[in-house]
């Protein structure tokens, strides 16, 4: 008696464009804190909204920040080598949209109150937390640069609910 034959058909591999969209849809389901990353110095004033920010280590305090090379903030961050990660809280949705779009740089900063800590990068006065950093190293990450940043000063505000971005919408937790 002969064993029955089984025909296995592998699913068609997605095209590069389909894979890219599939990946973007998956990343939309990965909730993340909403941050405004700012810089100022010889390269100019700039800022952008980011969710691709995470802790690397606490010894010494180090952050990872991903920055798209096509971002209008890229030349300034690259030249200044300082930045501040300002973690947003409930009520900052409009500010996030300003920094996430094509709004001219000075109009972005007019929407809030700012100060500075050690590096001179703008610190959002009512951010949940602000992490003032010096860029220590930069690695290639496809369309983005991966910035490894030494945290040199921290400002925390009490209370507030963190603003996260999940499923292409803002949520407070």
UniProtKB/Swiss-Prot annotation:
Reactions listed under catalytic activity: FMNH2 + NAD(+) = FMN + NADH + 2 H(+)
Source domain of life: Bacteria
Entry's Gene Ontology BP terms: nitrogen utilization; uracil catabolic process
Keywords assigned: Flavoprotein, FMN, NAD, Oxidoreductase
GO molecular function, one term: riboflavin reductase (NADPH) activity
InterPro entries according to UniProt: Flavin_Rdtase-like_dom, NADH-dep_flavin_reductase, RutF, Split_barrel_FMN-bd
Enzyme Commission code: 1.5.1.42
Primary enzyme class: oxidoreductase
Family: Belongs to the non-flavoprotein flavin reductase family. RutF subfamily.
Protein's name according to its UniProt entry: FMN reductase (NADH) RutF 2
Source organism of the structure: Rhizobium rhizogenes (strain K84 / ATCC BAA-868)
């Amino acid at each position: 008696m002969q064993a029955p034959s089984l025909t296995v058909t592998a699913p068609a591999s997605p095209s590069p464009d389909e894979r890219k969209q599939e990946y973007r849809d998956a990343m939309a389901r990965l909730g993340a804190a909403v941050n405004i990353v700012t810089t100022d110095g010889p390269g100019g004033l700039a800022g952008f909204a980011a969710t691709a920010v995470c802790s690397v280590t606490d010894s010494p305090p180090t952050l990872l920040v991903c920055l798209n090379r096509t971002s209008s903030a890229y030349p300034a961050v690259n030249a200044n080598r300082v930045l501040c990660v300002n973690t947003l809280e409930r009520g900052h949705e409009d500010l996030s949209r300003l920094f996430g779009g094509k709004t001219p740089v000075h109009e972005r900063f007019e929407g809030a109150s700012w100060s500075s800590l050690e590096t001179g990068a703008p610190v959002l006065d009512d951010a949940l937390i602000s992490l003032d950093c010096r860029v220590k190293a930069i690695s290639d990450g496809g369309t983005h640069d991966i910035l490894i940043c030494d945290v040199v000063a921290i400002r925390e505000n009490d209370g507030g609910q963190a603003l996260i971005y999940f499923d292409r919408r803002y949520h407070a937790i």
